[in-house]
Amino acid sequence: MRYLFLLNPAAGKQDCTVQLIPQIRAAAARAGWSAADYTIHTTEYAGHARELARAAAQEAAQAGDSLRIWTAGGDGTFMEAMTGVQGFANAAVGCLPYGSGNDFLRTYGTRAEFTDLDAQLAGGEVTIDLLETSLGLSATICAAGLDAQVAYGIPKFRRIPLCGGEMSYLLSIVEQLCGRIGRRVTFTIDDEELTVDCLMCAICNGRAYGGGFLAAPEADPADGWLDVMIVRRVGRLTIAKLLGMYKSGLHFVNGQLTEEAKPYFLYRRARRVALRPADGRGPIVATADGECAPCDAVEAVLRPLSGRILLPAPAYERFVAKRSSVDAK
């Protein structure tokens, strides 16, 4: 078994490498690893984690070894490594959450579990579904609409002096709320086609995105289905109430939309989803696991059980127990 840590110093509010490198070495020693058992790399540019992960997986495969990779950064760094190891059955990827969103872990456990290096090294490998999207591979959620527009606008405000992460986020929200809200969008959900006046939508393999919005609070990332949540366009006075419900996951309980949510939400289960603007206003902004861009059309296709991930020990035990329960039904 080979072990690799990929640390992204540009993720989050501060460089995680200074504190993490000695902590990794100490945890490795407690696990009985020698210095030759693992490697620590610091990424230097966008896409570097993908390159390093792929090279390591290929080298391990040629030697007949298995490989475990942990990324330290955000969801984008994690998905870079996941993309890099695609096609290598010998490799699995885990996440140390030191980015700004860290939504991947919310489907499986808590931040405390995922930052516990001893639990990470003692954890196990599981197989999950992945999403192939217009923005690349995703383990969690592909979304479009108001929330994606807010995310897309943040970098512009970060360039303003003394405008940090939270202020940039608030300014981007204000900008979007001052503009025209919502889009008319045509969805193709498996064999169903519908056109909706849409505030935003989420195609979900995992449960959360956008820094903790529980779009699909009961999503199972290994059940072979996507949970599709479409939020209808509403007036500005209703948005705050709607977003509060959406963030807390109170719109969806026991496998269905709540009565309070039904006027505002549409829910479907599918394996393939496509959407395109139907209002003649140009591209729609979409986001998926750290990537964000305007798109003329967005497509998300389920890739069943195509991702091999690492979970810290408590999360791994819960995942295995749940899968055993589901399989027994």
Regions found by a protein language model. Give the residues of each.
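ATP/NTP phosphate-donor binding region
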Residues: 1-69, 316, 323-329
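Glycine-rich beta-strand-to-loop/alpha-helix junction loops that act as flexible
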Residues: 9, 72-74, 96-98
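Short N-terminal binding/cap micro-motifs at the start of the first secondary-structure element
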Residues: 12-16, 210, 309
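Catalytic core of DAGKc-family lipid kinases
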Residues: 43, 87-203
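Glycine-rich phosphate/pyrophosphate-binding beta-alpha loops
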Residues: 143, 147, 202-217, 291-292
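Gly/Ser/Thr-rich active-site loops/lids in small-molecule metabolic enzymes
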Residues: 158-168, 211-212, 217-240
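ATP/nucleoside-binding phosphotransfer catalytic cores, i.e., glycine-rich phosphate-binding loops
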Residues: 189, 220, 230-329
